[in-house]
C-alpha cells in the first residue's frame, strides 16, 4: 500500500492506494467523527460492493445508506436532495460522516452534501473509477450540474481521507477506464514530461489493466494533484492548470447532454483541441502535438469534438466557464512538453480555426 498526503494545514488528509482496502476497517473507522455514518453510492456500485462495504459500519449508533441512480445525468439538485432526505430522516447531527462509495458523480454530490448539511460535516472519499481515483476524489472540489453549466453549483470541502482500492478497477467497464486515462494523461501534459513519456511506453499495459502500471499511474497522478492543491486550494491561481482540456470538454458535455459523452471522453477531445491551439500559435511544435494526440487515441479516447458542434456552440458554453475573468475567456494551454499555463493571451484567429477544425497545424 502507498500513502500520500495532501498538505493543507489543519485540513490535511492522507490518500491510501492499494489492493483490498475496501475490506479494511482501519482505513475508515479512525476517520469518523462519531459512531454515525451515511454511505452514499449508486445502483451499479451497490450491487457490486454495497453490502460487504456497509458491513464495516456494523455497531455504529447510526448507519444508513442511500443509493442514487447511476450516471452524470443524475448529478443534479434533485438527486442531491435524496442525500439530505436520508440525513434528516435518519436524524444525523453535526458529528455524522458521509462516505462516498462511487465515481466522480457520487463523490462530488456527497462532498457537496457534506459541505452544506448543518453547515459542514466530514466525509470520506472511496473512489471506484479510475477518473475519480486520480482526479475528483482529491482536492475538495464538490458540486452538482445545472442545465446551463457543469459544476456551477458547489463548494470547496476537503475529505477526511481518500481510500483508493485498486481492485475495484477489475469491474470497471472499458469505456470508463479510457475516460479515466484522460485525466492521467493530463498530468503528464501539465506538469511532468517524464511521466508523459512513461505513459507513452506503458499505455498498452494500462489499458490491459496491468496492476503495477495502474498503481504507479494512480500514485503519480495523485501526487501531482496533491502538490498543486497544496499550493492553491481554492483555484485562485496555479490550480486552474488542472483544467487542461476542460473548457472545451465542459462545452461538449453541456451541448451533448450530460452522460452522452463521459467526462473523460470530453476532456480527451478537449486536450486535443488545446494542443492544436497551442501548436497553431507556435507554443508547442507539431511533433509533440502529434505525440499527445496519439497517446490520447491509444487510450481509446475521442480526438475530435462532435461534428454537430459549431464554433458558436462552443463559445456559448465557454462564455460561462468558471475561468472567465472580468468577461474575458481564459484557457489552459500547453506551452512546452510537460508544462501548461492559464492564459487570456491567445490568438483569436487560431482559436476560431481550432473550434472550426479548419486550416493546418504549425
Curated annotation (Swiss-Prot):
EC number from the UniProt entry: 4.2.3.4
Residues engaged in binding NAD(+): 70-75, 104-108, 128-129, 141, 150
Keyword Disulfide bond recorded: no
Disulfide bonds: none
InterPro entries: Dehydroquinate_synthase (IPR050071), DHQ_synth_AroB (IPR016037), DHQ_synth_fam (IPR030963), DHQS/DOIS_N (IPR030960), DHQS_C (IPR056179)
Subcellular location: Cytoplasm
Gene Ontology molecular functions: 3-dehydroquinate synthase activity; metal ion binding; nucleotide binding
Xref: CDD domains: DHQS (cd08195)
Listed NCBIfam families: aroB (TIGR01357)
Name of the protein in its database record: 3-dehydroquinate synthase
Primary gene name: aroB
Amino acid at each position: 500500500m502507498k500513502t500520500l498526503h495532501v498538505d493543507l494545514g489543519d485540513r490535511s488528509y492522507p490518500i491510501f492506494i492499494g489492493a483490498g482496502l475496501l475490506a479494511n476497517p482501519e482505513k475508515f473507522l479512525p476517520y469518523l467523527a462519531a459512531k454515525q455514518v451515511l454511505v452514499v453510492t449508486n445502483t451499479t456500485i451497490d450491487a457490486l460492493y454495497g453490502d460487504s462495504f456497509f458491513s464495516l459500519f456494523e455497531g455504529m449508533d447510526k448507519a444508513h445508506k442511500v443509493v442514487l441512480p447511476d450516471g452524470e445525468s443524475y448529478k443534479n439538485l434533485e438527486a442531491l436532495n435524496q442525500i439530505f432526505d436520508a440525513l434528516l430522516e435518519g436524524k444525523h447531527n453535526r458529528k455524522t460522516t458521509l462516505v462516498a462509495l462511487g465515481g466522480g458523480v457520487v463523490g462530488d454530490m456527497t462532498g457537496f452534501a457534506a459541505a452544506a448539511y448543518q453547515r459542514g460535516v466530514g466525509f470520506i472519499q472511496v473512489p471506484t473509477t479510475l477518473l475519480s481515483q486520480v482526479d475528483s476524489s482529491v482536492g475538495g472540489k464538490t458540486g452538482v450540474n445545472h442545465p446551463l453549466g457543469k459544476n456551477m453549483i458547489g463548494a470547496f470541502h476537503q475529505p477526511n481521507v481518500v481510500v483508493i482500492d485498486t481492485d475495484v478497477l477489475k469491474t470497471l467497464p472499458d469505456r470508463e477506464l479510457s475516460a479515466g486515462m484522460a485525466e492521467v494523461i493530463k498530468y503528464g501534459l501539465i506538469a511532468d514530461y517524464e511521466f508523459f513519456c512513461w505513459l507513452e511506453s506503458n499505455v498498452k499495459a494500462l489499458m490491459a489493466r496491468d496492476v503495477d502500471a495502474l498503481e504507479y499511474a494512480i500514485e503519480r497522478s495523485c501526487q501531482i494533484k496533491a502538490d498543486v492543491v497544496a499550493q492553491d486550494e481554492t483555484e485562485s491561481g496555479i490550480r486552474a492548470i488542472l483544467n487542461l482540456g476542460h473548457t472545451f470538454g465542459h462545452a461538449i458535455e453541456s451541448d451533448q447532454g450530460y452522460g452522452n459523452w463521459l467526462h473523460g471522453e470530453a476532456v480527451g477531445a478537449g486536450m486535443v483541441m488545446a494542443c492544436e491551439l497551442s501548436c497553431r500559435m507556435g507554443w508547442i511544435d507539431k511533433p509533440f502535438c502529434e505525440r499527445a494526440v496519439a497517446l490520447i487515441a491509444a487510450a481509446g479516447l475521442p480526438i475530435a469534438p462532435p461534428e454537430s458542434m459549431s464554433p458558436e456552440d462552443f463559445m456559448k458554453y465557454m462564455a460561462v466557464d468558471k475561468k472567465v475573468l472580468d468577461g474575458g475567456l481564459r484557457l489552459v494551454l500547453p506551452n512546452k512538453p510537460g508544462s501548461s499555463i492559464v492564459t487570456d493571451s491567445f490568438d483569436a484567429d487560431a482559436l476560431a480555426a481550432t473550434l472550426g477544425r479548419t486550416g493546418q497545424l504549425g
